[in-house]
Amino acid sequence: METKRSDVEEWKKKKKKRKRVTMKQKNLFELWGLKDPHPKPPDPDDVQQSRAAAASPLNCPFYKKIPGTPFTVDAFRYAPVKACSAYFLTHFHADHYIGLTKSWSHAPIYCTNLTARLLNISLYVAPSFICPLELGTEYNIKGIKVTMLDANHCPGAALIHFRLPNGQSYLHTGDFRASKLMQSYPLLATQRINLLYLDTTYCNPKYRFPSKEDVLEFVVGVTRRYLNNHPKTIVVVGAYTIGKEQVYLAISQALGVKIYANASRRRILRSFGWAGISENLSTNGKDTPLHILPISSLRFEVLQRYLESQYGQYTSMLAFRPTGWTYSETIGENLNLIKPTSKGNITIYGVPYSEHSNFTELQEFVQFLRPEKIIPTVNVGNPVNRGKMQSYFQQWLKA
């Protein structure tokens, strides 16, 4: 799947000159004990990108670059990046696609099919710049073999496996929740990973939250009991633009009710192409007690207004805030110890449903892969945090 020459010509025409801003950046490959492999002589496309990058207003962090390749991962806000002629997007969350707009014209964007559809319908990125890749299929992109693997994060999220001509293999996890299933991925089970870019969102021993399956079972149980005792209850699940779908899908399936969401969310959900999803969505909130709201809306004053907007059809509300940040060491894996917060006729449960790996899962994933080097991609701004994470990695790999 090589870049078409016609696209390159189009990029050349659309390039705009920007004021050059020079910033010094430490060679962090050295800081992490890595050698930055000397890439092969750049092709004409790379040279063009390198010249444009001279005017880039921000320096791209080293952990977003794939050494020995003209690739970056989730680095759109830094575009144009010097010597980068292909930009990879791991998934459709704003902190990863920031910098992408409908005017994007720097270079092709490689992502999964589902993410590609979201780029088009939500950000209106020109289809000519979007290169969708099938999960589990190997592609030759500029001489590098690239494979997308399911990341067990949000819909469309991918681990990206890069295999260089010199035999080196790199894995970028993007955001992911490590699972036993990943140990059966042929690429991960049979090939040594030389360099692992690791999602370290919860790389701290205090984060040992339960499995997604256990949390879903808890949420369904609470909902069932609540509706049995209070039939006129509206059930609200907080969610991101994409993400947390399994929470409300589990409730819907267990209770046999449809899902109400606004038109924008319904459009996004339908774009996933999941079997039966369209038939399971309601366009009228009066037809079902299960409603989806932005997770940022789960505040009592906002929920009170929402309840009042239902014109008396419901007399109480049960809401779920599903995020790993609600996890408490005191509760651990005993979800029955969770105490909801209530105000008037509204009850909110914070449940540790996370789409990122907990500390134990990170350890198991690293010990399964046994990579030569690990580069953390989250919480790396503080040298103390970096040092702690490196000590964890060393302990795991010695075991």
Report each predicted region and the residues it spans.
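Metal-dependent catalytic neighborhoods of phosphoester/phosphodiester hydrolases
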Residues: 98-104
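Metallo-beta-lactamase
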Residues: 85-95
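Short N-terminal helix/helix-N-cap motif within the alpha/beta-hydrolase-1
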Residues: 97-98, 181
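Acidic/His-rich, metal-assisted hydrolase cores and their charged scaffolds
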Residues: 1-86, 105-169, 173-399
